């Protein structure tokens, strides 16, 4: 995040930080979950807001205009692209998280999905 903020500052750009919240899963197992849909929604929204506020503080310390937003989606890559389009972003700045081995196969790469499907340029920071 700090590298993205430095990049935006150098260009005199504003900043939109998003986090993606996974919706409550309505699987057969959801009836065995220890929390209700409302409890889940409240908990994940609170966690998202905490993360976003930490990020906002870091960016605003660099005197950069910043907006933070949480999107709800089962597909983080799709939500990132939708957010970038909705906020008329000129660039999507993403970290390249090096998941390795079996986890990479199971989880896939959200960064790769954004790179593949976004019509907005994507900068990957490693």
Question: Model regions: which residues?
Answer:
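Short, hinge-like loop/turn segments at secondary-structure boundaries
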Residues: 33-36, 84-87, 110-111
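Glycine-rich, Arg-bearing micro-motifs that act as flexible, cationic patches
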Residues: 91-116
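Small/aliphatic-rich secondary-structure junction motif
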Residues: 1-35, 58-67
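Short, well-ordered secondary-structure micro-motifs
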Residues: 27-30, 78-81, 104-106
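Structural beta-alpha unit
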Residues: 57-92
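Short, flexible loop segments at boundaries between secondary-structure elements
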Residues: 120-126
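A short acidic, glycine-rich active-site loop
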Residues: 36-50
């Amino acid at each position: 995040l700090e590298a993205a903020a430095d990049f935006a500052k150098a260009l005199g750009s504003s900043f939109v930080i998003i986090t993606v919240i996974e919706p409550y899963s309505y699987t057969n197992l959801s009836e065995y979950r220890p929390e209700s849909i409302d409890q889940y929604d409240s908990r994940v929204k609170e966690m998202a807001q905490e993360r976003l506020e930490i990020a906002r503080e870091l960016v605003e310390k660099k005197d950069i205009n910043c907006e933070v937003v949480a999107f709800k989606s089962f597909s983080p890559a799709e939500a990132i692209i939708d957010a970038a389009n909705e906020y008329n972003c000129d660039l999507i700045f993403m970290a390249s998280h090096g998941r390795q081995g079996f986890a990479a196969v199971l989880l896939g790469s959200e960064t790769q999905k954004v790179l593949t499907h976004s019509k907005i340029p994507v900068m990957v920071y490693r």
